[in-house]
Amino acid sequence: MPKRLDINTILVIGSGPIVIGQAAEFDYSGTQACQSLKEEGYKVILVNSNPATIMTDTATADKVYIEPLTLEFVSRIIRKERPDAILPTLGGQTGLNMAVELAKSGVLEECGVEILGTKLSAIEQAEDRDLFRTLMQDLNEPTPPSEIIHNLDEAYSFVNEIGYPVIVRPAFTLGGTGGGICHNEEELIEIVTSGLKHSPVTQCLLEKSIAGCKEIEYEVMRDSNDNAIVVCNMENIDPVGVHTGDSIVVAPSQTLSDREYQMLRNTSLRIIRALGIEGGCNVQLALDPYSFQYYVIEVNPRVSRSSALASKATGYPIAKLAAKIAVGLTLDEIVNPVTQKTYACFEPALDYVVSKIPRWPFDKFESANRTLGTQMKATGEVMSIGRNLEESLLKAVRSLELGIYHLELDHLKELDKETMKKRIIKADDERLFIVAEAIRQGVTKEEINEWCEMDFFFLQKVENIVNMEREVKANVGNMEVLQTAKEMGFSDHYIAAAWNKTEREIYDMRKENNMTPVFKMVDTCAAEFESATPYYYSTYAEENESIVTDRKSVVVLGSGPIRIGQGVEFDYATVHSVWAIKEAGYEAIIINNNPETVSTDFSISDKLYFEPLTIEDVMHIIDLEKPEGVIVQFGGQTAINLAAKLEEHGVKILGTSLEDLDRAEDRDKFEAALTKLGIPQPVGKTATTVEQAVAIAEEIGYPVLVRPSYVLGGRAMEIVYRQEELLHYMKNAVKVHADHPVLIDRYMVGKEIEVDAISDGENVFIPGIMEHIERAGVHSGDSIGVYPPQSLSEKLKEQIIEHTIALGKGLNIVGLLNIQFVVFENQVYVIEVNPRASRTVPFLSKITGVPMANVATKVILGQDLVEQGYGTGYHPEEKEVYVKAPVFSFAKLRSVDTTLGPEMKSTGEVMGKDLTLEKALYKGLVASGINIPTHGSVIITVADKDKEEAMEIAKRFHEIGYNLLATAGTAQSLTEQNIPVQVVNKIDSEDYNLLDIIRQGKAQFVINTLTKGKQPARDGFRIRRESVENGVACLTSLDTTRAILRVLESMTFSAHSMKEITQTKRHEVVHA
């Protein structure tokens, strides 16, 4: 049926900030949906709270609201805009939950708004565990034995009947939040309590564990005419028991017989039809490896992480087509945008193998529990494509950017068989590497299968890789062996180490022997029809399908998988850079490996290469395309780290030169440059040994800030207050030597300022200056940023502008630069300069209207700032106040300390904007998930060094009617200041104590600052973790606390007795 003409305006709900379980895939799907609806002539209104996305660019929709995704704000937008319909199925779990809340509140009915795509009843049937189970029973579809529970007693009675292990699945949550596998009563109490707390409807499904079955996913589409197709089916290498977002996944499925494939396909189509879903849907199934028994695990009635993967794996743009189906078009009316000949009702066919490996944040959080279960922990993922599974897997391994080029990790070589067995059974992020190590050490496939029930097919593939390693080592210099190894995806890096040569020597050896990969096209139809997509992957085969044009081209390096410190902000900059290259008349080529992002949508660039970002893989593309040069400054540290090797290969780095990049990153060169420019910086030195570090710290004086050089996201950065902490850091956090020095700076407790600027070598243009609420010492990515600065004098602002211009010119920056300053005792010091795009680029671009990545790209391509209508100086400040607030995923990562410091911990960000700082802060805090009640109780436990400062804060909480709770030490200080306080027992007390208050939800805020000595077993750590587990806002920085107080005070009417007012006035008269 043709598209609907009875609706004109559609509100699309975004997915909000990036958190574990909901990452950049919704920027991709949301952007596609908005463009798709606009193509059909609808007016599109978008609401999302995340400024770091392409989706929230003003060009994506007709009207863009960057506001909190809460009932209060979304209702206000609906009442103001009066859309005809809302489309919530492209905004992840956030979008679905928002639609349910809007419907229940009555606002949709009040404003006559209908829900498109998937009916409310279908959302509830798929998301409500009880309704879903009933539907499956009606369809005669098997589900594991299960029970819906609302409290612990119901959980006990189910377990007594069915036995352990059981899986807990909370209703209406994201990424398995709050869920898990329980093997005993202790785990049952902990996980059920957590699950009920995280479910917005206080409901969990308890089901008998079917861990060990194969986990299969079907990505299906259906339209209003009941046409339904399977876009892609995927198989998890990890059996059931590990969340699919934490599983290694391959597409298409590799181990199903035709009968099994058709059986599960029919089930998936039957379910999507029964739910009446119009659009995309993801069905997760479990299959017993020894029979045809299967179970339906769950259904996501929306576009999901898996649909982003399926879209990139097949080239079939699910979100784009789901949006068209939502407005009434049918699959047999929509042309497949890939072939531009066939229709969307043709099921895609693949003649290659796709592998997805999750990217976990454990390199950032060494104390985190690495065990994988039903609650997701990965922040992002990589995808790779090969002609066989071995090639595909090894390409994915080297895409992870953990400095790994092969399926082996040195530290696993020491493991004995018993340890390997335990870790393979338990499943952690290194399981596949441990399986390979076990095979190297002679453990049989049968034993490994017994331990973890991984299919023999996958174990055989790992064994093939291990056997090939032996071949490579036994045949040094043999070209036939080299050819076979390359066909299996072995890297030059691995072969060089095995043959005792350099990577460059292997590369040259291959070129001399014409041993180079070809590029194949991703075309949705296994080459059955001609395809129009410029979307390629490399493989060692005969025919090359990537045709080089005679146009001048520029290569942009993407930023790889989403991880803490390098988020979707860099993808935003990459996409804008690609658009600018096209505007400037060049062919834009992008290399990236993240299936979740907008940059890997083949319609963005002229050519997309889905490849690992290693020197070998990038050089293959450059050798073929022979571009004018490569842009590295938008791909975060990933791309910057490739610059030197690319230049060694004779590749031109466009923009800031390698020498100047190095001058900003190398400590001694940077110091020399600052001295020459007369710009002050905190006293600091470089240490290459532990002894040197101790001597430097003594000379500078504690506290000192220590960090390795060349890092992103403050990795392994710490403030240390005394010598034993420094020794602990040097021993545990870094491996210091001449090539990897450690930087040691005096730690200045001052106001931190962040500046983004664009330089063309002559002119330096500054779109914005941001002030951080938390003082220096908290990583800029974890600070609340405010634009324009609220407390800087004009004199200090001028100093900052002068220093920025001097640095842009003095460091010969061509393109973007990001500078962090600290204001200490009314003097501006430079902390660091990053000669690249920073994570604040999208935020400032949206606020100021200056498309920073676009302008910087054109500068890099030779169009100076004046030609583009900008000059030297500071862009006029906006009237409104904008706040960038960090969002954390601590609830997903057990045993991680939530204290803020110089190492970045946030996964995403939101924006709040309004006419006053207080209102903007309120929006930013609410959007980031912090509840701001106007009354209640606050627990205060602070370190001795913070007691004095905490008194003023406590007094202000008391003034607005909050009840103060504190342990004996802090309580005594409060009583001495005549501030009423209730004493609570410390956490080691047998009686009712501080943790009980948090668990029972009797505190609205916990203020807890760090006591020195960082062992996680400490009291403070337990208080902070208990707060996170129970959803209580835990404030570890007094600066953040003050910001929240400002908001609370602005929301509270003053309530003083007349006597207090007259006393104050008399006091003022006396002192006048």
From Swiss-Prot:
Keywords: Amino-acid biosynthesis, Arginine biosynthesis, ATP-binding, Ligase, Magnesium, Manganese, Metal-binding, Nucleotide-binding, Pyrimidine biosynthesis, Repeat. Mn(2+) 2 binds at residues 298, 300. It catalyses: hydrogencarbonate + L-glutamine + 2 ATP + H2O = carbamoyl phosphate + L-glutamate + 2 ADP + phosphate + 2 H(+). SMART domains: CPSase_L_D3 (SM01096), GARS_A (SM01209), MGS (SM00851). Binds 4 Mg(2+) or Mn(2+) ions per subunit. ATP 1 binds at residues 129, 169, 175-176, 208, 210, 215, 241-243, 284, 298. Mn(2+) 3 binds at residues 820, 832. Residues 930-1072 form the MGS-like domain. Residues 133-327, 671-861 form the ATP-grasp domain. Residues 547-929 are annotated as: Carbamoyl phosphate synthetic domain. It is an enzyme of class 6 (ligase). Its cofactor is Mg(2+); Mn(2+). Mg(2+) 1 binds at residues 284, 298. Mg(2+) 2 binds at residues 298, 300. CDD domains: MGS_CPS_II. One of its GO terms (molecular function) is carbamoyl-phosphate synthase (glutamine-hydrolyzing) activity. Residues 930-1072 are annotated as: Allosteric domain. Mg(2+) 4 binds at residues 832, 834. Residues 402-546 are annotated as: Oligomerization domain. It comes from the Bacteria. Large subunit of the glutamine-dependent carbamoyl phosphate synthetase (CPSase). CPSase catalyzes the formation of carbamoyl phosphate from the ammonia moiety of glutamine, carbonate, and phosphate donated by ATP, constituting the first step of 2 biosynthetic pathways, one leading to arginine and/or urea and the other to pyrimidine nucleotides. Composed of two chains; the small (or glutamine) chain promotes the hydrolysis of glutamine to ammonia, which is used by the large (or ammonia) chain to synthesize carbamoyl phosphate. Tetramer of heterodimers (alpha,beta)4. Belongs to the CarB family. The large subunit is composed of 2 ATP-grasp domains that are involved in binding the 2 ATP molecules needed for carbamoyl phosphate synthesis. The N-terminal ATP-grasp domain (referred to as the carboxyphosphate synthetic component) catalyzes the ATP-dependent phosphorylation of hydrogencarbonate to carboxyphosphate and the subsequent nucleophilic attack by ammonia to form a carbamate intermediate. This is Carbamoyl phosphate synthase large chain. It comes from Bacillus cereus (strain ATCC 10987 / NRS 248). The gene is carB.
